[in-house]
Amino acid sequence: MDRRSLALLMVVVMMSPLTGSIAASSSASTQGGTRHAEAQIVEPDHLTSVPEQSDIWWDPHSNWWDVTTLDMDRNGIHDSIQEAVGPVNVGLSFTRAFTDSDRQILLSMGFEIRQELPVVDAVLLGAIDPTEAVGLSQIDGVAMVERYGSLVFYGDVQTPAVKASNSSDYPIGAWDLGLSGSGINIAMVDTGVDNEHPGLVGKFVAGYDAVCYVHSDPQCILAGGREDDGSFDPDDGNQHGTACMGMASATGLEADGTQSQFYGSAPDAGLVDVRIGTDVGAGPFENYLLEQEFYESAMNGLQWIIDHRDDAWPGVEKEWHGIDIISLSWGITSHEDGGSDGSDMHSRILDEAMELGVVVSNAAGNSGEDNDGLSGMSASSLSITVAATDDKNTVNRTDDEIAGYSSRGPRKDNGDGNPLNELIPEISAPGTNIVQAEACVTSGSCNNFLGGDASENTYTGRGSGTSYATPAVSGIIALVMEANSELTPLQIKEVLKHTSELRGEPSAPEVDPYWNREFGYGMVDALASVELAIFLRDSGQTGSIDPTLQSHGLNLTQTDVINITGHAWGQAGSVDRVEYRVGSGPWHEATYSDPPGELGALTPFLWHVILDPKELEEGQHIVEVHASSGDSHSLPVFYEVTGEGGGASSRGIPTAALGLVVLVAMGWAGSLVLARMRSPDEEEAAIDAELVD
């Protein structure tokens, strides 16, 4: 071998270890595992594809009337009607839309139709003799003869405690992100709202009086009854409605123009004032003199909201059109042992509202720990049911407890085989000893009946109840909707659950590892909710979020490796994969623990993201993880990790590119050696050749 060949061989031999060391980042063993997807490490006992999961065992398309516990003998009659003595108020729920033919049949049988509820394919008939229920149940298309329920109203530090406003305990609140509920309308369905109150001035965009009594507002009678175009502005003859709207949206202004700290969660949200109760038969401390009319008014008000949810209200700007949120601080008692199972028409109408794009926030009830089940409304399968905490009159949440009066779950089983919709309440918020905006009726010198108003009133008198926790959540929903207008009601519900502060041990771990019968999925966190809503908006992920896909982080450790562990499962089907990314980088699939046996439906499996910090650029990085199925995925979880900047990927240069650089360097070095080993004659010839014209 001549000198030139020997020199070239020596260069190649000396350079080859360098190429090997660079290529090793995609295949070398680290900490007992192998490399996978740049910085990821796959442990030997981990799976690289998602474990197989069993299908759900219930039929998600079953008809409520085929499974409801309200009619155990399946004769089409609410069981409590068959036990009643004397007149009972009833409605008919149909398996299809109510028709003119049905209307004529009822009239021919001598029944008056008091209210039609097309959104739930139902009509209200009022009082009948219980013996007439059999004939009604035999009308073609009748799913069930239902009994009316009885309506019950559930009745400073609240806003900073939910992290809407900032405080010394929580220096950043949702308002600090530029959110206040502007452009979002809350339908306060209650005893009316005195929106002349200094903290509620300018909020009214529309209203409707679902029940018109002279005792509460003579203007209703003088105007000729109800106006259904949204132009009527009801007053509050009780106090309950004004107090609730204040907790959702008060600005804190006083009559003299000074600023108090008595804000609602969304101080710039608008008011759609839907009165369903009055000072006769409606208040929490009154006799129910007009129970039948009260129930019908409540259903009438909810039907009106759904019918007018997209209306352009008279005299208001386009941004204030429609109805975004229903806030309900009352319930409907059940006639069955164990409370409502959510299949009654007053629960179903809330489910329909959620599916039609109106978010429903409703109170869990004030029956405490040993309650006889949740009421209708509180038992709705899809709406957001709110429990109340006692904040001990402090902003700091560490001392908060569930309020003694707050109704506990779960809801009565509705017979559909799905255990998830029994996990109510879903969320909790402060509801104890809350300062109220004063309605006109609370002041001795003010009475709507005499033409007075609440314009000189202030914020006094403390009240407690899930009534008062609910509007705080309604205001937070307004903040979330303002932050991300593309979120659906069910996505918003999932955002609130996902970002809540966990409290209490899981009450049904075989169904869900996080739900607690007192707190639901935890204490609502306005700041975390709007931060997540903004992230989904800015990252373009909103349309891909499936609320039935679950992924939650469990643990992060960082020593020689970064080890993130969590679990995932599907609530309506299987998870295809769990994915992660570092910063805005490409998505990679996580690895999985091998489960000891077959995974049943609703059973979480463990996922892992194990990274070499030396392969990440020096500094802090956000790792984002979600569970996916098809083109949809769960809400993400985030972990902050520290890169140590020791690897190729940390410099942003792919391994293949580095290998190419080395090969080029080898070629250059080899050519240099060859050039230096040329004979003098060869070198001179080369120079002469370059000088030729």
Task: Give the positions of each predicted feature.
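Secretory targeting signatures
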Residues: 1-35, 645-693
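Autoinhibitory N-terminal propeptides
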Residues: 5-124, 129-173, 644
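Surface-exposed intrinsically disordered loops and tails
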Residues: 56-83, 168, 172, 211-235, ...
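C-terminal subdomain of the subtilisin-like protease fold in secreted/lumenal serine endopeptidases
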Residues: 63, 323-327, 482-571
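Subtilisin-like serine protease catalytic core
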Residues: 173-208, 212-296, 319-324, 355, ...
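Extracellular S/T/G-rich loop segment that most often corresponds to the catalytic His/Ser-adjacent loop
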Residues: 208-214, 378-478, 482
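Short acidic, glycine-rich surface-loop motifs adjacent to enzyme active sites
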Residues: 302-340, 363
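Long, low-complexity serine/threonine/glycine- and acidic-rich segments characteristic of extracellular
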Residues: 544-555, 562-647
